[in-house]
Amino acid sequence: MKISIIVGGKFHAFNLAEQINKKKYLQQIITSYPKSYLKKYGVNKNKIYSIILKEILLKIFNKINFLNHIFDYNYLLCEYFDNKASDNINYDKVDILVGWSGFSRKCFIKAKKFNCIKILERGSSHIKFQHKILTDEYKSLGIKPNVPSSQMIKKEIEEYDLADFICVPSQYVKETFIKYGIKKDKIIKIPYGVDLKEFCVVESKKRKDNKFRIISTGSISVRKGSHYLLEAFKELSLPNSELIFVGSFDPDFKKIIKRYSNIKNIRFIKKQKQELLRNFYNDSDIFVICSIEEGLAMVQAQAMACGLPVICTTNTGGSEIIDDNINGYIIPIKDTQSLKDRIKKLYNDRRKLKQMSKSAYEKANNELSWEKYGDRMLNTYRGLLKTKKNI
């Protein structure tokens, strides 16, 4: 079995490549990251093709805030990567071609001439569902929507059709695909894992204070529902508490932040390297994520591995890894009252908080490693190849 991966970025592709490579099944990975970045994942340079210009241009364009409202540079960069990648895949040596959504249309078209299985990785909901739910949320806030363009929607829909299978991380995502006409037997559902060496309880680390600390990591944005957490925290006004966000701001969200600038016990910390992030988890009591739309936010498993109970919305995909009322709480999207109730419950009941923290840690360590994820993926790939041979 030989597997190749196409990914215009990082996502969880490098974790997947690491697990496939350990079993000697990795043929090739094409990415926009430099070859040196995959060294920590144990992938040999001769198995990597790097299209680094895509990543360089993306970083430059992202710094020019208004640019995306003038033209869809993200789509153009995806097209550039896709075209370049499609010319550098060893199609005749591949049994399974795994491509990330938005980067794989041309690759899959060329792959049709060869006898390989095409699997599309989609980490978020169906792009039409994503577009609608986010457009509605932006409009409700009076902000110009920052959503997938019509060009990107068309590209991804074509990828859905070209793929033999679509791999998603949660039941929530799977249901959005079914809603938009994708057959159930075309969808594979496998939740992501977490690096248990990188994210863990640091026993030697002592808390600097006894504040009840809520943490949220990842982008601070409309999509992540950060405004619902801000509003809930403001309304609760809990004594000796603190809310910290660790991550980068979406430019559009800065308008919303101004409404909460007078609250002293809210901190915004810039995006951190993965190896430093665990220190912030270890210095907190609970993790909260209020996403309007997601796939399976990997920060949830990170927080659990560091011993934090998670409060999440249904649309984070968290129900795949969180047991409601045992190691976290799952609430409806946009429900500030439910969010306040769950936060207050853990604030008032420290015994319950301790029990849930222990359960979260155990769940992550027993079930959520990348090794277990890799085993599930490889078993799925083997099953698909076996079925193909029997047809």
What is the meaning of each model-derived region?
Residues Y172, G193:
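Carbohydrate-associated surface elements
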Residues P309-C312:
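Short hydrophobic beta-strand element within catalytic cores of glycosyltransferases
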Residues D324-N325, Y329-T336, K345-R350:
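Conserved acidic donor-binding segment of nucleotide-sugar-dependent glycosyltransferases
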Residues I292:
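Aromatic "clamp/platform" in nucleotide-sugar-dependent glycosyltransferases that forms part
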Residues Y41, K59-D72, F114-K155:
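Acceptor-binding helix/loop patch of EC 2.4 sugar-transfer enzymes
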Residues K206-K224, L230-E235, I244-V246:
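Conserved donor-binding/catalytic core segment of Leloir-type glycosyltransferases
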Residues K271-Q272, N279-S284:
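Short alpha-helical donor nucleotide-sugar binding micro-motif in glycosyltransferases
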Residues K254-E275:
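Nucleotide-activated donor-binding/catalytic signature segment of Leloir-type glycosyltransferases, i.e.
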